[in-house]
Amino acid sequence: KAEELLMTEFITSKNSGSKLIHESEKISGLVKILKTLHGAKLFYRNFNMFTYIYHYMNILKKDGLPKLLVPILNRIDHLGQRLAFYRTNLVPCHNDLLAENIIIRDNQLLIVDFDYSGNNDPCFELGNLSVEMEYDDEQINKLVRSYYGEINENIISRINLQGVVSDIGWSLWSYVQAQN
């Protein structure tokens, strides 16, 4: 099986840590970076977490799906159908915004590790970020206001749902990694 390899320069930096990304100005700074990314030329591939969820579920079913996941995964099709409506305006996304992929160099935030990048609903990106950083309602409102210019309850609902999808997908990824 052929592997793709990309080598880049080493960036001397420190990990941002999820607590640092809770600060209001850091949320605004990160949103500025994301809006630049989301406004860039489309990537050559799309990213759909549901594709990964089904893939990971199939791997896990071979050894028995963890019982704790069964009730959640029984509803994943319904959630996917509801969110499919929003997959029409895809933008370039990172799709894996855990704290380890957000670093600080010379007091500047940088996003690294684009192996799951692809075109996606920007609300998935914001939902993924909000879950990984464990944002509370106030911080999610700050995120939405910074990104969209206003608080919109429909957008907040989409971000929260996409955060659940992200959490399910990356949790399944963790289960798969633990089995290997």
Language model: regions and residue ranges:
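Active-site acidic catalytic loop and adjacent metal/ATP-binding pocket
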Residues: 78-124, 138
